[in-house]
Amino acid sequence: MKCVYFGSDVFLPCLARLVGDGHEIVRIYTFPDNNGDFSHCRQMLQAAKELDVPVRLNRPGAQELESLIEDDAQAFISAAYAYKIPAFSSEKAYGLNLHTSLLPQGRGRWPLPRILLDSPQAAGVTIHQLAEAFDAGAILAQTPLALSEDEDLDSLTAKIIMATPPLLSGVMGDLATCWANAQPQDEQQASHWPVPEGKTRTLDWTQDVASIMHKHRAFGGCMVQASVDGQTIWIEDVNAWQEAHTLTPGTIAARYEDQLVIAAQDGLVLLKRWYQAG
């Protein structure tokens, strides 16, 4: 099947699976590597070069898609793509999106932190039809994922990356049947989660160390914020332990080299990699 692929590095294994399954990639859409929300497309650009596939960095226009359909493009596949794909008739071509939650729960650009924070039942992968509203199209296939007690953003991302290519392969292998049997999403069960910011992404030193580590794991290398000594900082890597102390939560208990130890409710938190905000 002739496919147009929209995506970034995180789902590059899906592109490789499509090629391995014999599908023809006629164009790849990605975006400049300094894009603020999705900053990893170097491998996608390299893959396009190796496959000798035309690549575009612009936002696609409706006329571009119509021209591709006229040139016999049959499927438009979106996976961690930064821009909205213009609508086109499903009678002319298939439009699919890969989403990192069990829809209809967890609509939105980045559901993984919320899944890890308080919604483990939404962990999974969904492939759905492109629709006018983001993440609202009928479901073609999905698979749930189990979370471990110490699941973090990196491990959940890895599980999703491993689960998605075979799921996509199955859909593409019998796309007409999957399309005909697609299940509309239950709007009464739907939830839309904005990109977490503010309090949701900020450590609270008055909490216990278990809660602090839980929030850190939900964001991992994408970092959480915290206030230390009156300054806002971004924290990339921490450790923590329970220990009795008499310090006020948020107090700097120790400072050495570039690391800080901060008092929490029932223990201490070691900031191993952190950066001044701004």
Language-model-detected regions and their locations in the chain:
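Short, solvent-exposed recognition patches
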Residues: Q231-T248
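One-carbon transfer enzymes
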Residues: M1-S227, A240, A254-L260, A264-A277
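Extracellular/luminal ectodomains and secreted, surface-exposed scaffolds of diverse proteins
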Residues: P249-A253
